[in-house]
């Protein structure tokens, strides 16, 4: 193509001013207002709790419109922290939100949930920025809903346990009530006494001795008025065994508190320095089976000198903790032994004829 017929056009336009276009590269739309309110990111947009509250107030039933607009189930595309402003402004907003989270904790989640209404708990996917600047989905709200359901189930289980009372009751009261109810079941419906000699009728009702006497007089069951003959009355062995086991358990429970009470009383007496007189007399009879001037035979033990073993002696002194000082009769040698090393000497008629003054010469 030749350039013979071309001529340059006159340039009459105003000169252009060239500026740096880097700040304009990310500036799309108007700048978001700087605020400390808790915000939620849905897609590429950021919504504030105040705007959500205003929308909820304008629409009294935001189940469909508000949920479709605000709680859109569209997943995150791109960077959820990009609010349409510059990078520097985003950093400032993040720092301000972090400081606000440090002061208020998790109040933003609660406030947003409360402003959005009670129905927002079961809403769709919602992206919420927390303290660590991370996105949370609707599982957070479903967890809250699940916790409420679990609490309701727990309360229903606690209430519906067959006895119409909560499981968190005092153990002593529950055990006493169970014992009383079991006693009522095992008691004669006519006399109220335990059916240790239970007899069963053909109709299936069981009575004790007193109830059976009334049944024989009436010739009919006291409960269902069905005719009964004396030959058809048979012993209820199973119920008799149950009554015997109940009586044993009741006796053991009645004995245990008294034993614990007695042991606690003894501990208190020992703590205050008061000894038990019955125990002291019993220990005294065990530790001091001999008296002064009693004739004993030295049995000895592994620490007793062999020359004393088997010799006859007489008790001269009674010491503490069951110890005695005895003196042999043949050579008047004294030794201190415990009561376990001594035995009562057999009765000897010749020893009775010996005058007491002969023994007192060397004592």
Swiss-Prot record:
Catalytic activity: S-ubiquitinyl-[E2 ubiquitin-conjugating enzyme]-L-cysteine + [acceptor protein]-L-lysine = [E2 ubiquitin-conjugating enzyme]-L-cysteine + N(6)-ubiquitinyl-[acceptor protein]-L-lysine
Disulfide bridge positions per record: none
Cited function: Functions as an E3 ubiquitin ligase.
SUPFAM superfamilies: RING/U-box (SSF57850)
Keywords associated with the record: Transferase, Ubl conjugation pathway
Biased composition (Acidic residues): 87-107
GO molecular function annotations of the record: ubiquitin-protein transferase activity
Residues covered by the U-box domain: 181-253
Domain of life: Eukaryota
PANTHER family the record matches: U-BOX DOMAIN-CONTAINING PROTEIN 62 (PTHR33644:SF5), U-BOX DOMAIN-CONTAINING PROTEIN 62-RELATED (PTHR33644)
Organism: Arabidopsis thaliana
GO biological process: protein ubiquitination
Protein name from the UniProt record: U-box domain-containing protein 62
Top EC class of this enzyme: transferase
Record region (Disordered): 74-117, 343-363
Membrane-spanning parts: none
Pathway participation: Protein modification; protein ubiquitination
Enzyme Commission code: 2.3.2.27
């Amino acid at each position: 193509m030749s350039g013979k017929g071309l001529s340059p056009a006159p340039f009459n336009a105003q000169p252009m001013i060239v500026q740096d276009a880097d700040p304009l590269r990310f500036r799309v739309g108007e700048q978001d207002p700087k605020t400390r309110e808790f915000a939620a990111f849905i897609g590429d947009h950021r919504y504030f709790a105040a705007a959500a509250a205003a929308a909820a107030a304008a629409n009294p039933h935001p189940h469909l419109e508000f949920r479709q607009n605000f709680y859109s189930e569209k997943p995150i595309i791109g960077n959820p922290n990009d609010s349409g402003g510059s990078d520097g402004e985003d950093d400032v907003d993040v720092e301000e939100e972090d400081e606000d989270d440090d002061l208020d904790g998790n109040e933003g989640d609660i406030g947003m949930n409360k402003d959005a209404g009670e129905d927002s708990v079961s809403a769709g996917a919602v992206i919420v920025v927390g303290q660590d600047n991370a996105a949370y989905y609707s599982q957070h709200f479903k967890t809250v809903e699940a916790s409420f359901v679990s609490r309701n189930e727990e309360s229903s289980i606690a209430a519906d346990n067959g006895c119409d009372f909560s499981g968190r009751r005092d153990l002593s009261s529950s055990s006493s009530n169970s014992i009383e109810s079991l006693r009522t079941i095992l008691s004669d419906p006519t006399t109220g006494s335990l059916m240790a000699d239970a007899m069963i009728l053909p109709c299936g009702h069981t009575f004790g001795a007193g109830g059976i006497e009334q049944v024989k007089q009436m010739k009919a069951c006291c409960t269902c008025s069905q005719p009964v003959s004396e030959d058809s009355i048979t012993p209820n062995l199973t119920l008799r065994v149950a009554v015997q086991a109940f009586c044993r358990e009741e006796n053991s429970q009645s004995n245990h508190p008294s034993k614990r009470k007695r042991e606690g009383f003894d501990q208190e007496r020992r703590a205050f320095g008061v000894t038990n007189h019955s125990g002291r007399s019993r220990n005294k009879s065990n530790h001091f089976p001999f008296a002064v001037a009693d004739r004993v035979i030295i049995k000895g033990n592994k620490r007793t000198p062999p020359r004393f073993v088997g010799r006859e002696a007489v008790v001269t002194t009674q010491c503490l903790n069951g110890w005695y000082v005895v003196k042999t009769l043949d050579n008047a040698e004294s030794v201190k032994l415990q009561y376990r090393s001594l035995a009562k000497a057999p009765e000897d008629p010749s020893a009775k004829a010996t005058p007491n003054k002969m023994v007192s010469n060397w004592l």
